[in-house]
């Protein structure tokens, strides 16, 4: 299971002062560009990609529709993603599928998509349908993060992940049940077929994230042969 950690600078000075040594035990860097004003994202990008040269980067523009910090029209959203991709070609690009389905056709030629769905309010009853629709599109990664209201919600998310991974072994999934209640799903991803787990360093980017230090200890125990 790969460990993903966010970088969330709010200006170019913060981007330039990122301590990359904190990320040495991380497999993937997620640049949460939505912590910046829209007009600053392209100008801050060089600092991010230079800081993490040689590392795998996920470009994420989490909008207010899915718990993020920026409000964009569908066209603004896809245009900004395409601009960053054209210049920097990040290893992965997060695309909020259900929130921006109207412009998804503009992303069909992109081989590095993380199709994502986030629900910070609940674990919806149609979660299985969301899994199915996104999996059929065969992106690099299907990412689903939902908020549980019960233990059963957590188990449902994990069971759906296991089921869809079994039926689609070549498809990568990154799924999590958020908040304290859902923390188990972040720790047991390998068991159910979730390839990524998101951790926090100085600041969490989503509820229920485990710190990098704790995650390393837990994974060491889970992956130990003894």
Swiss-Prot record:
> What positions constitute the catalytic site?
118, 143
Q: Which pathway, metabolic or otherwise, does it act in?
A: Metabolic intermediate biosynthesis; chorismate biosynthesis; chorismate from D-erythrose 4-phosphate and phosphoenolpyruvate: step 3/7
**Which GO terms fall under molecular function for this chain's record?**
3-dehydroquinate dehydratase activity
- Keyword Amino-acid biosynthesis among UniProt keywords: yes
Q: Which UniProt keywords apply?
A: Amino-acid biosynthesis, Aromatic amino acid biosynthesis, Lyase, Schiff base
Give the multimer and partner information.
Homodimer.
Protein name, UniProt field: 3-dehydroquinate dehydratase
Q: Which organism is it from?
A: Streptococcus equi subsp. zooepidemicus (strain MGCS10565)
The answer, when asked if Amino-acid biosynthesis is one of the entry's keywords, is yes
Among the Pfam families in the record, one is DHquinase_I
Q: Where does 3-dehydroquinate bind?
A: 30-32, 62, 186, 205, 209
Q: Which family does it belong to?
A: Belongs to the type-I 3-dehydroquinase family.
Q: What class of enzyme is it?
A: lyase
Transmembrane stretches in the record are none
- What are the BP-aspect GO terms? 3,4-dihydroxybenzoate biosynthetic process; amino acid biosynthetic process; aromatic amino acid family biosynthetic process; chorismate biosynthetic process
Q: What is its EC number?
A: 4.2.1.10
């Amino acid at each position: 299971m790969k460990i993903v950690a966010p970088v969330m600078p709010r200006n170019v000075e913060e981007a330039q002062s990122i301590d990359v040594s904190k990320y040495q035990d991380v497999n993937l860097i997620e640049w949460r560009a939505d912590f910046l004003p829209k007009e600053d994202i392209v100008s801050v990008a060089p600092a991010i990609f230079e800081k993490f040269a040689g590392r795998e980067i996920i470009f994420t523009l989490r909008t207010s529709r899915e718990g993020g910090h920026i409000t964009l029209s569908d066209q603004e959203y896809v245009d900004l993603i395409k601009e960053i991709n054209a210049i920097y070609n990040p290893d992965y690009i997060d695309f909020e599928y259900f929130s921006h389905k109207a412009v998804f056709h503009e992303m069909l030629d992109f081989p590095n998509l993380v199709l994502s769905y986030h629900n910070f309010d609940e674990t919806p009853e149609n979660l299985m349908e969301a899994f199915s629709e996104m999996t059929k599109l065969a992106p690099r990664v299907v990412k689903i993060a939902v908020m549980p209201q019960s233990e059963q919600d957590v188990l449902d998310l994990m069971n759906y992940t296991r089921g869809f991974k079994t039926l689609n072994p070549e498809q990568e999934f990154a799924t999590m049940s958020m908040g304290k209640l859902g923390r188990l799903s972040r720790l047991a991803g390998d068991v159910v077929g979730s390839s990524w787990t998101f951790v926090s360093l100085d600041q969490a980017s989503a509820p229920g994230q485990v710190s990098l230090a704790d995650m390393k200890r837990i994974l060491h125990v889970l992956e130990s042969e003894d």
